[in-house]
């Protein structure tokens, strides 16, 4: 069980020395996570339970989520890294990547043949809101073409993958390294 160390709103310690609990359990809620559980598996929508805490000092709430869940994103962080790797490193078309990562088989007419979501992910990485280690350790120039930036992000994230013998393809390493790059 993971507990919060401090309030994300006011910074109060969850349990100050000699004091009572400041962050108290405030129930759970369901959260969707989209994408495959492992590279090459069928993309799916999974529902996970996340734990909520309420701060007795400021009244704010905070949520503890599994490693694969990231703030304001429906896809798992591993699925996002894998999609960027497939597009940037492997050279797959965006529609082919979408079929592997997106659990929805049908799209609206305005989205036929394209998928803009990975470009939003790239922007979030560049702004330090997603895969923070990439932005911190290896930022890229803003004039780079999005596919080149995606390859760069995937390469950096792959470096965080745990060692394995034999070494899996770089796109799989990006999937596996995403949690550590977050």
Regions found by a protein language model. Name each.
Residues 56-154, 161-164, 171:
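Short, positively charged, Gly/Tyr-enriched micro-motifs
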Residues 163-182:
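Extended alpha-helical scaffolding regions
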Residues 1-69:
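Short, conserved DNA-binding cores of transcription-related domains
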């Amino acid at each position: 069980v993971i507990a919060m160390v401090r309030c994300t709103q006011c910074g109060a310690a969850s349990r100050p020395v000699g004091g009572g609990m400041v962050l108290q359990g405030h129930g759970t809620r369901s959260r969707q996570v989209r994408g495959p559980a492992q590279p090459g598996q069928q993309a799916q929508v999974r529902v996970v339970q996340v734990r909520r805490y309420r701060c007795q000092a400021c009244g704010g709430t905070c949520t503890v989520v599994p490693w694969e869940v990231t703030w304001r994103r429906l896809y798992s962080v591993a699925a996002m890294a894998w999609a960027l790797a497939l597009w940037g490193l492997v050279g797959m078309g965006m529609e082919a990547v979408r079929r592997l990562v997106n659990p929805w088989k049908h799209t609206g007419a305005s989205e036929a043949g394209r998928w803009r979501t990975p470009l939003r992910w790239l922007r979030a990485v560049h702004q330090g809101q997603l895969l923070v280690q990439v932005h911190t350790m290896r930022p890229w120039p803003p004039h780079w073409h999005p596919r080149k930036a995606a390859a760069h992000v995937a390469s950096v994230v792959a470096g965080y993958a745990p060692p394995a013998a034999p070494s899996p393809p770089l796109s799989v390493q990006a999937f596996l390294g995403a949690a550590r790059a977050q």
